[in-house]
Amino acid sequence: MNATEVTDTTQDETVYNSYYFYESMPKPCTKEGIKAFGEVFLPPLYSLVFLLGLFGNSVVVLVLFKYKRLKSMTDVYLLNLAISDLLFVLSLPFWGYYAADQWVFGLGLCKIVSWMYLVGFYSGIFFIMLMSIDRYLAIVHAVFSLKARTLTYGVITSLITWSVAVFASLPGLLFSTCYTEHNHTYCKTQYSVNSTTWKVLSSLEINVLGLLIPLGIMLFCYSMIIRTLQHCKNEKKNRAVRMIFAVVVLFLGFWTPYNVVLFLETLVELEVLQDCTLERYLDYAIQATETLAFIHCCLNPVIYFFLGEKFRKYITQLFRTCRGPLVLCKHCDFLQVYSADMSSSSYTQSTVDHDFRDAL
């Protein structure tokens, strides 16, 4: 074999080896159709959550200021929970338009809206947790709660809660940015260094602060409340237990799927799970479960406010005296029925009964 033949053979082997090395490399996971799915699925659902959440939580704020006038810790927590949900839903029109088209609002709003979304998310979860603790003190430690459940302590704990929520949301403010790729503008979180580490920490932060800690506290508080109520001869006990069960089940049902999918995406990010089909399913699942979790902010006014008999009475008064486009509300028969029910109700005056009605 001469030198020319050796050279040709070497080149052929190089081409052969390079070809099969390229073929053996993992191909990028194509995710065609995921954005198209989001364009159809997300905007109408975001709009619905925005409208329902804006209406329900605005009514809560209006009633609290007009009738309750923030006289207790419970009132303070209800107000802050409503403000948290309002802050959260006010970001949804931006995300809805972004899902349908692209980000057209600039870098400043990209950072602000991302931050609003996270602050509303964390503060809402935290105030749900505080509502559970408030109920626990009112029913399990009724005497001690007379000193602990004051307006002053309510304001102090609320300020601390907002501070923690703002601090936990700082990554959304600092790392959110706009960039253009293939003539499409994005608003996303981008980490300059240790990208994988930051993504994993952010996801775990949501799992821990958004589900594990609040759920643990809720389960403890409500289990102790139920145990205390078992020793009370209270005609409202069964209703209370059903309501507690509903609160926990709804929280689990709306937030657990999103956190599970988020945790699975963390495993994909760490390359613990490496499956293209799974990644595609997770991208669809994160859109569906995130929207499901958003609906919970529409239910908060119903769970913590509208189901209370005193608050239904205030809402009746509010709509019966309303003016303008809602003037026909005062003619609604169901509101008059609620009003009649309120005036005909009779309750015992025990400490636990009084605190229980305030808490629920």
UniProtKB/Swiss-Prot annotation:
**UniProt key word Glycoprotein:** yes
Q: Kindly report every residue range on the membrane side named Extracellular.
A: 1-39, 99-111, 176-206, 268-284
Entries under Pfam families matching the protein: 7tm_1
| Topology in membrane | Multi-pass membrane protein
Tissue expression, as annotated, is: Expressed in the thymus, macrophages and T- and B-cells.
A molecular function annotated in GO for this UniProt entry is: C-C chemokine receptor activity
Biological process terms from the Gene Ontology for this record are: chemotaxis; homeostasis of number of cells; immune response; inflammatory response; interneuron migration; neuron migration; tolerance induction
Which UniProt keywords are present, listed alphabetically? Cell membrane, Disulfide bond, G-protein coupled receptor, Glycoprotein, Membrane, Phosphoprotein, Receptor, Transducer, Transmembrane, Transmembrane helix
Coiled-coil features, chain-numbered ranges: none
Where does it reside?
Answer: Cell membrane
The intrachain disulfides are C110-C187
Q: Which residues lie on this side of the membrane: Cytoplasmic?
A: 68-77, 134-150, 227-242, 309-360
Record-annotated membrane-spanning stretches: 40-67, 78-98, 112-133, 151-175, 207-226, 243-267, 285-308
Post-translational modification note:
In natural killer cells, CCL22 binding induces phosphorylation on yet undefined Ser/Thr residues, most probably by beta-adrenergic receptor kinases 1 and 2.
Glycosylation site list = N2, N183, N194
Cross-referenced InterPro entries: CCR1-9-like (IPR050119), Chemokine_CCR4 (IPR002239), Chemokine_rcpt (IPR000355), GPCR_Rhodpsn (IPR000276), GPCR_Rhodpsn_7TM (IPR017452)
Which superkingdom does the taxonomy of this entry point to? Eukaryota
Q: What are the record's GO terms for cellular component?
A: external side of plasma membrane
What the protein does comes down to: High affinity receptor for the C-C type chemokines CCL17/TARC and CCL22/MDC. The activity of this receptor is mediated by G(i) proteins which activate a phosphatidylinositol-calcium second messenger system. Could play a role in lipopolysaccharide (LPS)-induced endotoxic shock. In the CNS, could mediate hippocampal-neuron survival.
The similarity comment for this entry is: Belongs to the G-protein coupled receptor 1 family.
- What name goes with this protein? C-C chemokine receptor type 4
Organism of origin: Mus musculus
| Encoding gene per record | Ccr4
